[in-house]
Curated annotation (Swiss-Prot):
Pathway: Cofactor biosynthesis; tetrahydrofolate biosynthesis; 5,6,7,8-tetrahydrofolate from 7,8-dihydrofolate: step 1/1. The lineage of its organism: Eukaryota, Metazoa, Chordata, Craniata, Vertebrata. InterPro entries: DHFR, DHFR-like_dom_sf, DHFR_CS, DHFR_dom. The keyword NADP applies. Homodimer. This is Dihydrofolate reductase. It comes from Homo sapiens. Belongs to the dihydrofolate reductase family. GO terms for cellular component: cytosol; mitochondrion.
Length: 187
């Protein structure tokens, strides 16, 4: 049985997550390290986490950084016939991807599942029934964006007051303030 289903995202005050295939804000090294640590760390000996992303998100990662190392990389696409070079798996939908994690080739290898973008994949995950956590980095200013994070339904999602391994105080890099939040739903 695969562990928890999670989304991880950094989002500006105006809910932006991307611009021209890149992040809308300058690179924030410690925020990126947080993403690496959260998506890579497995709590189960001998297992790896699975990162699920849409095709655009995959191609927005610099080629030298693909696949995201130390993680099993799965790309979602209805157009592609085989996984893009470097990706480990391809699925047509999030449901198909989650079914794949129950197959023998992955069931014993995958610990946590992390959804890393983009908008439509986040939306599909957030509307998925069952237990889901959202790891949201709130970038505390507006940035011009062309890609946005879906609205978080606070009827369904509860902001957790604290979470192990997640700093609760405001961070600052390059004059940009941000904070880490964790939301959880169980329906």
């Amino acid at each position: 049985m695969v562990g928890s289903l999670n989304c991880i995202v950094a989002v500006s005050q105006n809910m932006g997550i991307g611009k021209n295939g890149d992040l809308p804000w300058p690179p924030l090294r410690n925020e990126f390290r947080y993403f690496q640590r959260m998506t890579t760390t497995s709590s189960v000996e001998g297992k790896q986490n699975l990162v699920i992303m849409g095709k655009k998100t995959w191609f927005s990662i610099p080629e030298k950084n693909r696949p995201l190392k130390g993680r099993i990389n799965l790309v979602l696409s209805r157009e592609l016939k085989e996984p893009p070079q470097g990706a480990h798996f391809l699925s047509r939908s999030l449901d198909d991807a989650l079914k794949l994690t129950e197959q023998p080739e992955l069931a014993n290898k995958v610990d946590m599942v992390w959804i890393v973008g983009g908008s439509s994949v986040y939306k599909e995950a957030m509307n998925h029934p069952g237990h889901l956590k959202l790891f949201v980095t709130r970038i505390m200013q507006d940035f011009e964006s062309d890609t946005f994070f879906p609205e978080i339904d606070l009827e369904k999602y509860k902001l957790l007051p604290e979470y192990p391994g997640v700093l609760s105080d405001v961070q600052e890099e390059k004059g940009i303030k941000y904070k880490f939040e964790v939301y959880e739903k169980n329906d």
